[in-house]
Each structure stands twice: as C-alpha cells, then as structure tokens.
C-alpha cells in the first residue's frame, strides 16, 4: 500500500537516536532490498486474482494502523523491529539488527509525504534509503497457496521493542508504531538466480541508480491511480527437505507465461528438447493453417540487375558491322539452294567462312522426295496372261506342299505293308498312279459293277473283304473350291485338299471298277488318324476322336453311335425298303474337326464341307444304289448276329447279379438256390428268341444265344 498523502502530523523529533555503525547499515540495506523483491513477487501473484472488494477493506485497515503508528512515533519512542515467531516451536526469534537511528520522524515524513515548499532535489530532505519498495505492506497471510517459487527461508530480523509487547505473529500491535517500510521481511531472494528477461515481474521497475539519487520515484509510484493489493508476510512452516522438493525448487515456472518455450531456459534443457519440444509443436492452434501464414520474402535490394543489351554483330576478322549483310542473307536451312547466292562481304576471311558453311549444309541436306504419278493408267498385260500367271503360281505352290507332305510320309512310315490305316494312304496313291480313267458323270441304270477291294488296300477293321454286286444309277461329282488353300484336281478324278498348315486333309481317288474312294484324315504332320472313309459302293464310316464308330452307312440304311460306342439312332433308306415299318431317315450333321464337316441328307446326298481362311470347298459323294432283288434282302438287316449275342450276354449278367443279391440276403441258409429269376428277365429272354427267329441268323449263332439265356436248373 502507498503511504497516506496529506499534511504531516506534528510530533516531536527524536534527537536522542543513536548512530548505527556501518555494519548494521549495510545489513539493513541488503535486507531491505530482499524484502522489496519478495513483496513485488507476492504483489504480482495476488494481482491476478483481481478481488477489488478485499483490496478496499485491506486498504482501510492499513490506513488505521498507519495512523496509530504515527501517533506512537510522536511520543519519541525508538524504532522497534518486528519479532519473528517460529510456527513450529512457538518461540520468538532473536533480533539481529536495528534500524538506523539517524533518521527521525520528521525527516521521514518529509521524505515520504509531499507538502508545501517541498523540494525533492534539496539535499536536506534526502534520506539515505536503499531499495525501498511500496510502503503498503501488510502482515496478513495470503488467501491461498499459489505456485510461487520455493525460496530459501531465513529467520527474520527482530528489532528492539517495548516491554510487554506481544510478538508480531500473534498480534498486530507491534506494527502500529512504525511505518511498514521499516519492517523486516521473512524471505531472502539472494540465493535464487532468475533470468531478468524471462521474469521481468520479479525485478524492480526502477533502476538502482535512480533510487539512490533522489526520492522522485516514490512520488511516481504513489501517484498511480490503481491500488495494488500486497498481502502481509506470513511465516510459513518449513517442510522437511526431500529430493523431490529440491528438484522442484529448480523449476521456476510462471503460470502466466504464454510461451511454453520458457522450459528451454532451465536446468533440464536437454531433457525438455528430447521429451517435450516435439509434442508441444503438435498441439492444435487457433487460426488459419500454417500454409496460409505470412512469410516474409527476402529482399534482394543488394543485387543489381543489369538490363539485357543486344550486341551489335561485328566481324571477328576485321571488326566491321554485319547488320546490313545479315539483313540480306537467308540463314534458314530449309531454303538452301544448290548454287548459293554470292554476297558482298567485308573481308576475304569472312567470305571463305560463308562458303564453307554453305558447302556443309548442302552435304547434310536430306535427299528430296521422289513423287510418283497416281493418275489412271492401262493394265499391264491381258486378262488371259494374268490368269495364266495365277494358275502357274498356284501349281508351284501345290507342288511344294505335296512334295513336303510325301517327304514326311516316306520318312516316318516303313515300306512294309500292314493292315492299318497308315499304309492305306500310300496304297491309294499307288493305285492312283497305276490306274487312270476319265471322270464318270453318269452311267446307265442296270449296269452291274462289281467292286473288289483287296485286303492290302484296306485295314482289317474296315471289313471290306467281301464282294458286293450293286448297280450304279448315277454317279455325280460336284467340286467348288478356292485358291487360298491347297487344292489339286487332275483329269482322272483325283482330288487333294490340304489344311492351312500344309498337312493333307482330303484325298479322293478312283478305283479299279470305275468307282472312287475318299479318305479324310486329321491335321497332323506325322501318323495322321483317319476321321472318315467314303466309297461309291454305298458304304461309309465316320469315327470319333477316340476311334469309336460315329456313323456307319450301307446300302440298306445306317446307325448313329456316341463316343462310348452306344447306338443312338438307326434308319433305313426309303428307296430300298419303302414298305418297312421303321421310321424314315432324318438328316445327320457331323463336325470332324474345326475345318471339315459332314452332311448326310439322303443316300445320294452326302457331302463334305471344307472351310478354311474364309473360303469353302464342297465335295459331293452321294451315290444312288439300287438292288435287283429287294425281296431277297432279309428283314431287320440292321440287327447282326453280334448284336443278338450282346443282348443274350446282358440277360445272363443280370441273372447272375440277382443270384449274388440273394447270397447277400441269406448268407447261411441255401434258400437262394431255390430262388427263380425275376419275371422281367424271363420276358426279355422270350423277346430275344423271337427276334433271333425273325432275323434269319445262322443256326450256330442261334444255339449259342439259347445256351446263354437258358436258366440253369
């Protein structure tokens, strides 16, 4: 609190004060300076709370105490210090120093309170006060414990007092005799080193040199309008020293400090950088993002930029100006002429340089494009010549393909004759070379042709060893093909078709009896498999990729089987047996591979379709065959003896399975021996016997079937 300003109260001057020695004056100055620092610190802390009502009440109490102290001073009593009271032991502390007695009451009031005719520069009223703080000190305890630094405590300096006066901690009567500026202080800040830049509030605002010169700084402080609350000093209980408290003393943190970087100035700077600095930087901030923050651009005022200046072209040899020469000269590389223009140069050396440059540019110049005429012109040669050239080229191509194919066959196949389909192609080619005839387009009805096929020319599994007497009513061959795949047709009726890979696909050859035979094989260079076989006698066969018969045709009809060999369809030709009770024939379409397809519409409407590279070739192989005596043809010709034997074996197998089931049901007793076959097996046996009598099979085969289906007794 600031001292009460006004008219100084009259009183007697104490002229009997003793002169203190120099040692006591020095201690008092140091203690006063320490007290000033401590009080400023406490004032800063309590100023934040902003309790104005308590400040006014405290102000009134302090003024009353000051008035009472001023009255006691007038009685001529000596300066007395405040006795310290130890809270832990409850004993008053011993006094150490005394206030100097060189200043009486009147001199103090002259120095503190302004009056008429007061001259602050007068040396008469300039007391020797060092580091005096605001006189509004109080002994009241602070309302709460704030986070203030832990300072080293010292015993207060007790001053002499009158007999019978109580201690300062228990009563405030000892403070009524003297102004608060002369009271002793509890804290000592001399042992604490605090940075002045970090904590400006802990240091005095008035410099030491100003305080020692005059008392004008006291007047400026007292003239402030805002009254600051400074609590009284209270002696706190000293806690036992521990390692944690000792570490806490080194951390001097001001809670009002807005910047968190104050931790860097402390003893544990390295620990702060490693543990806290990175996390503190990531704290969220208020405001625009950092990318939008203002960044001061660096100034380049010290750099002097010169304007670009165009140099005048000058000759390197003689130094003359070349602007007029370059204005007339065409330096573009696109307009280079064979004979460049001659320019008047300034000197001979420059002229030689230009000539050399022109020669080099002519050397590296690309040749000019030669344009051809695109106007219409007459064709080269006649149409006949162009057609002959195409036929000749096609013939050479086919010869090369056939030569390559025969070379592969002769290399892979042995010359010995075997009964398989591999030697059949070679034998057929030999027949083509030996026998030749004119192409047959039509023959008169009634002519009997006997087709005899030797065993060496066909595989044994084809079963073409018997002779057939048939009458050829019409033999007609139709051929349509393109030139984009291998095709060759000679005068004797030989036809060759090759796959796009060059392998032989279809070959059609004439035979000895004015007929033909056609073979279709797969697309492989070595050991090709036969896919289909057709002849003019009316017998044809097509095969699955696994070798089983797919479609079989004879002069009476045909049958259709699956890959497992199971018969799916059977039919007879309508021309051979019109009165038959069997269903009429339905067309059959087969795809032997990706290039060849078979179409069977009627006996005389059988064709092969070859499709490759977008072109198609069709070969008609249908033959109309008529029998002389149709009544001699046995009924149900489509059922052979082998088929009937298979049915008999099937009935026998089912009967054995039935007995095996009985053994499993009655394993101990022999009742299964007395069990008869199921009724459905007996019915199948009767039907098979009737079928055998109607089919006209041989007697030997009939006896074998009866033995198979006969139930053992």
UniProtKB/Swiss-Prot annotation:
A Pfam family the protein falls into: FAM194
Keyword Nucleus: yes
Cellular component annotations (GO), alphabetically ordered: nucleus
Compositional bias per record (Basic and acidic residues), positions renumbered to this chain: 18-43
Biased composition (Polar residues): 133-150
Coiled coil, from the record: none
InterPro entries referenced in this protein's UniProt entry, alphabetically: FAM194_C
Keyword Disulfide bond: no
Biased composition range(s): Acidic residues: 44-61
Annotated region described as Disordered, given as residue ranges: 1-177
Top-rank taxon: Eukaryota
Protein keywords: Nucleus
Subcellular location: Nucleus
Biased composition (Low complexity): 165-174
Comp. bias intervals (Basic residues): 1-17
Record family assignment: Belongs to the ERICH6 family.
The protein's name in its UniProt record: Glutamate-rich protein 6
Organism: Mus musculus (Mouse)
Classification lineage: Eukaryota, Metazoa, Chordata, Craniata, Vertebrata
Gene, per the UniProt record: Erich6
């Amino acid at each position: 609190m600031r001292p009460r300003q006004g008219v100084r109260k009259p009183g007697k001057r104490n002229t009997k004060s003793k002169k203190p020695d120099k040692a006591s004056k020095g201690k008092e100055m140091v203690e006063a300076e320490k007290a000033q620092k401590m009080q400023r610190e406490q004032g800063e802390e309590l100023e934040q709370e902003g309790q104005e009502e308590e400040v006014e009440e405290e102000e009134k109490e302090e003024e009353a105490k000051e008035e009472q102290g001023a009255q006691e001073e007038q009685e001529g009593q000596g300066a007395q210090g405040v006795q310290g009271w130890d809270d832990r032991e409850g004993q008053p502390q011993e006094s150490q120093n005394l206030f100097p007695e060189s200043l009486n009451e009147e001199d103090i009031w002259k120095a503190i309170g302004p009056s008429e005719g007061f001259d602050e520069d007068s040396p008469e009223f300039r007391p020797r006060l060092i580091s005096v703080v605001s006189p509004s000190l109080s002994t009241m305890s602070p309302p709460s414990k704030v986070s203030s630094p832990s300072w080293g405590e010292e015993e207060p300096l007790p001053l002499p007092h009158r007999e019978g006066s109580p201690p300062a901690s228990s009563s405030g009567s000892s403070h009524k005799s003297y102004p608060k500026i002369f009271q002793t202080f509890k804290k000592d800040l001399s042992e604490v080193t605090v940075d002045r830049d970090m904590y400006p509030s802990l240091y005095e605002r008035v410099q030491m040199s100003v305080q020692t010169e005059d008392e004008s700084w006291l007047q400026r402080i007292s003239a402030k309008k805002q009254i600051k609350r400074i609590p009284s000093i209270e002696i706190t209980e000293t806690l036992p020293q521990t390692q944690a408290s000792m570490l806490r003393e080194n951390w001097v943190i001001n809670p009002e400090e807005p910047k968190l970087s104050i931790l860097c100035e402390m003893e544990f700077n390295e620990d702060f950088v490693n543990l806290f600095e990175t996390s503190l930087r990531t704290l969220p901030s208020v405001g625009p993002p950092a990318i939008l923050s203002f960044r001061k651009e660096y100034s380049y005022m010290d750099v002097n930029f010169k304007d670009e200046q165009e140099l005048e072209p000058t000759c390197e040899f003689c130094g003359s100006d070349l602007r007029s020469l370059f204005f007339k000269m065409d330096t573009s590389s696109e307009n280079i002429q064979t004979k460049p223009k001659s320019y008047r140069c300034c000197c001979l050396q420059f002229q030689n340089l230009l000539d050399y440059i022109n020669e080099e540019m002519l050397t590296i110049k690309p040749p000019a494009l030669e344009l051809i005429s695109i106007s219409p012109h007459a064709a080269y040669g006649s149409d006949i010549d162009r057609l002959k050239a195409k036929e000749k080229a096609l013939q050479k191509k086919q010869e090369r393909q056939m030569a390559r194919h025969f070379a592969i066959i002769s290399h892979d196949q042995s010359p010995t004759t075997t009964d398989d389909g591999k030697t059949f192609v070679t034998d057929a080619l030999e027949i083509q070379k030996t026998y030749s005839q004119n192409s047959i387009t039509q023959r008169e009805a009634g002519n009997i042709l006997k087709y005899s096929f030797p065993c060496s020319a066909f595989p044994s599994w084809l079963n073409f060893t018997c002779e057939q007497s048939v009458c050829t009513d019409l033999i007609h061959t139709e051929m349509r093909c393109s030139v984009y795949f291998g095709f060759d047709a000679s005068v004797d009726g030989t036809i060759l078709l090759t796959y796009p890979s060059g392998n032989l696909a279809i070959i059609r050859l004439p035979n000895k009896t004015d007929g033909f035979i056609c073979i279709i094989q797969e697309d492989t260079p070595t050991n090709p498999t036969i896919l289909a076989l057709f002849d003019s006698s009316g017998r044809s066969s097509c095969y699955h990729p696994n070798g089983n018969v797919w479609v079989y045709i004879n002069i009476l009809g045909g049958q259709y089987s699956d890959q497992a060999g199971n018969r799916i369809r059977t039919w007879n030709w309508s021309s051979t047996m019109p009165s038959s009770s069997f269903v009429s024939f339905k067309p059959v379409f087969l795809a032997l591979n990706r290039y060849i397809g078979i179409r069977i519409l009627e006996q005389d409407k059988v064709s092969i379709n070859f499709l490759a590279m977008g072109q198609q070739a069709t070969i008609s192989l249908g033959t109309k065959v008529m029998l002389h005596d149709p009544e001699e043809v046995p009924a149900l010709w489509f059922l052979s003896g082998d088929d009937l034997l298979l049915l008999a074996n099937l009935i026998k197998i089912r009967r054995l399975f039935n007995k095996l089931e009985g053994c499993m049901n009655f394993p101990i007793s022999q009742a299964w021996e007395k069990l008869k076959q199921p009724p459905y097996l007996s019915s199948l046996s009767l039907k098979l016997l009737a079928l055998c009598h109607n089919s006209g099979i041989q007697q030997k085969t009939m006896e074998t079937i009866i033995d198979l289906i006969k139930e053992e007794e």
